[in-house]
């Protein structure tokens, strides 16, 4: 059995004296592990870092075996990502989210969103907006997608500013006003189709977005598995909070 595919390194662990087991999120083969001979060597260390993109060739005698990888770098992001605290936390959190997906189950949209997010970590606000969208995409892939297209009460597609914490559906301003204290806020960048790039956010939008996705991830995905939010998620949000508090450069 063998295949070749694009992949992003999620994690690496040493195996024996010189090998490493590498976990990738691939475009067409999902989250997939394989052994890299010599992967524990100093020569391989710069390549085998979370966030780097590779061309992976996998080979095994049987499909269910761990198999062996040969990896070729296509984009080396790790050195840049290690230069900022929000990126370090963000990459770790993204990997923890990807691990919620079944192993070897293709999720091409998740792969594409991961690439988009990793490539925009130089701007902390844009990266945060992408990460919130990534969490929404994980919810959808696992069967718990939110319906943010129209008001659950009226069917209106305008002034959608709330989300029901029970149904995960959008609620318009007029329909939600009497229960505003019980509803979650829907950030502007999640209700504006033109904001897919991640631009157009405010600090409050980001906090509202993490509150929104965090509520549904915890209730629908993590708690049923006996898990909680990753420490890296909290670290990322704290790093974003500090960045927002810094004085703007003149």
UniProtKB/Swiss-Prot annotation:
Instruction: Write down the superkingdom of origin.
Output: Bacteria
What SUPFAM superfamilies does the record point to? ArfGap/RecO-like zinc finger (SSF57863), Nucleic acid-binding proteins (SSF50249)
For this UniProt record, give its keywords in alphabetical order, as a comma-separated list: DNA damage, DNA recombination, DNA repair
Query: Which GO BP terms, alphabetically?
Result: DNA recombination; double-strand break repair
The record's Gene Ontology cellular component field reads: bacterial nucleoid
Pfam families of this UniProt entry? RecO_C, RecO_N
- Which InterPro entries does this chain map to? ARFGAP/RecO (IPR037278), DNA_rep/recomb_RecO_N (IPR022572), NA-bd_OB-fold (IPR012340), RecO (IPR003717), RecO_C (IPR042242)
Q: Which PANTHER family did the record assign?
A: DNA REPAIR PROTEIN RECO
HAMAP family in the record, alphabetically? RecO (MF_00201)
User: What does this protein's UniProt record list under function?
Assistant: Involved in DNA repair and RecF pathway recombination.
By sequence similarity, the record places it as follows: Belongs to the RecO family.
Name assigned to this protein:
DNA repair protein RecO
């Amino acid at each position: 059995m063998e295949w070749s595919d694009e992949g992003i390194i999620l994690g690496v662990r040493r195996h024996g004296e010189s090998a490493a087991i590498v976990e990738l999120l691939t475009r067409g083969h999902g989250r997939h592990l394989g052994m890299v001979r010599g992967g524990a060597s100093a020569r391989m260390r710069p390549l085998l870092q979370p966030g780097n993109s590779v061309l992976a060739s996998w080979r095994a005698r049987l499909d269910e075996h761990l198999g062996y990888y040969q990896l070729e770098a296509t984009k080396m992001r790790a050195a840049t990502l290690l230069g900022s605290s929000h990126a370090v936390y963000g990459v770790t959190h993204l990997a923890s989210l990807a691990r919620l997906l079944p192993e070897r189950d293709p999720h091409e949209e998740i792969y594409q969103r991961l690439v988009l997010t990793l490539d925009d970590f130089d701007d902390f606000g844009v990266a945060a907006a992408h990460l919130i969208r990534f969490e929404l995409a994980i919810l959808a892939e696992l069967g718990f997608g939110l319906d943010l297209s129209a008001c659950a009460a009226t069917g209106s597609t305008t002034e959608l500013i709330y989300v029901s914490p029970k149904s995960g559906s959008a609620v318009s301003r007029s329909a939600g006003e009497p229960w505003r204290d019980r509803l979650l806020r829907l950030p502007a960048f999640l209700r504006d189709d033109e904001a897919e790039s991640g631009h157009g956010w405010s600090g409050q939008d980001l906090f509202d977005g993490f509150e929104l996705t965090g509520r549904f991830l915890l209730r629908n995905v993590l708690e049923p598995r006996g898990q909680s939010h990753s420490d890296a998620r909290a670290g990322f949000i704290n790093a974003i909070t500090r960045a927002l508090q810094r004085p703007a450069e003149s």
